[in-house]
Amino acid sequence: ESQSIKQTVDQLKSISIPEATQHRKGYRPWGWYDVLEEGDTFKVKRIYVKPGESLSLQRHSRRAEHWLVIGGEATVQLGETVLHLSTGESVYIPKREIHRLKNETQNPVYIIETQIGDYLGEDDIERLEDIYGRGK
């Protein structure tokens, strides 16, 4: 049976199916993300942030992002500005802008993140502060 799985994965790789080599769901200390759709210059994720948790204070050199809150209440730092976003509200994050999302409530936060740029790898991140001890 494991040989059959390997053959299936090899077939998927041969026709360039991204799921053959990339996980669509990623787990992080603050919650998780699920890649809903992606192309050469865009990626759409659903992101869940646990109560009391936050993403790194970070910036990206090769992509802009748009965050739409679809559940809960998020606190967003965008440069020196702090925004409080509720369900249905959104924020645009230009390339190289310092930003962070926090969930300061007792309820989950869900957002849709749309990334736009010429490179969308998870390694396009400069962490300026990270409460989980992840490197810059």
Predicted regions and their residues:
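A generic "binding-loop/recognition-motif" signal
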Residues: 53, 62-63, 81, 97-98, ...
